[in-house]
Amino acid sequence: MEFKESTGQLDRSMETLCAFLNCEGGTILYGVKDNGKIIGQEVSDNTKRSIAEAVNRIEPFVELEISYVPILETDKYVIAIHAECQRFMRPFTYKGRAYMRIESTTTFMP
């Protein structure tokens, strides 16, 4: 699981999502600090469009589970993108580069 404060970190988090697809799978949560504190983020049509465009840069095409979880008594959400490990379609690339996870670090595949 990877925490991101906002989709302002979308490019880097898509690299991590690509690594999840190439390894054991995983989930990225936007609107959550590194320490696990939920802060949420506002979700507009532009936010959803940016996420869709970023996900479409992952090749080969894969279906991901994207959820928008409302935070009570606010107008903010936690955005969850879940990737199942895809053993038979690897390697996955984002913007033409393949990624993998080593511990909690995302790095280029050799």
Model-identified regions with their sequence ranges:
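Conserved N-terminal catalytic/coupling substructures associated with nucleotide/phosphate chemistry
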Residues: 1-110
